[in-house]
Amino acid sequence: MANRERFSRFIGFGSGADIFAPETPYGLSKRVIANSIRETPDWHNIRIFGVFDENELSTRFIKASILRYLNKEPMQIHTDRIMDFFYMKDLVSVVDKYLTEKDPPKEVNCSYRDKHTLSEIASQINELGHHRVGINIEQAGMSFYSGKPLEMDVPLIGFSKGLFDTFQILSDKGTTV
């Protein structure tokens, strides 16, 4: 660490892949980084399983599902799973807390207490507007990509409100695929 004296705190953005896919190159790299962070004073790991808002790529599950809904097309799920999606504004609040708190936790998961399957999220999207679309699940089965809930004193907007706000913004823009 040749430049260690140039900063007082390091914040790394981890991934659930370091837990659920450590055999992949991406998961292995995230695991190595997480282990390095654990061993280094004043280094911190903010683990993200999934993050969403209206600015995410149109290919990401939540935005793609909202856009399909707005276009009156069925939503697509490859394999249903329990998945932790964290609202971007809540992630910003977590990062802000790390920047301003004297001794933040060494590691946190950006994960809400309430867990949702992809099919439940699609059903929630279906309830946000005035029509209904189909929900196609391509492959049977259930897995999870989820972590222990965030344990920090940070005011959070939460998943449901974040989903509603994202839907409203995309709906107001008249966004289409």
Task: Annotate each predicted stretch with a short phrase.
Residues 1-28, 44:
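Conserved Rossmann-fold NAD(P)-dependent oxidoreductase catalytic core, especially the SDR/UDP-sugar
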Residues 1-6, 36-37, 94, 98:
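Hydrophobic positions on the long internal alpha-helix
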Residues 6, 39, 71, 103-104:
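Residue-level preference for short coil/turn positions at secondary-structure junctions
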Residues 9-14, 44-50, 84, 109:
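Structural signature of the Rossmann-like NAD(P)-dependent dehydrogenase/reductase core
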Residues 15-18, 50-56, 115:
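Active-site proximal helix/loop that lines the substrate pocket
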Residues 21-23, 55-57, 87, 119-121:
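Short glycine-/acidic-enriched loop or helix-start segments at secondary-structure transitions
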Residues 27, 31, 35-83, 92, ...:
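NAD(P)-dependent short-chain dehydrogenase/reductase
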Residues 73, 77-177:
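C-terminal substrate-binding subdomain of Rossmann-fold SDR/epimerase-dehydratase oxidoreductases
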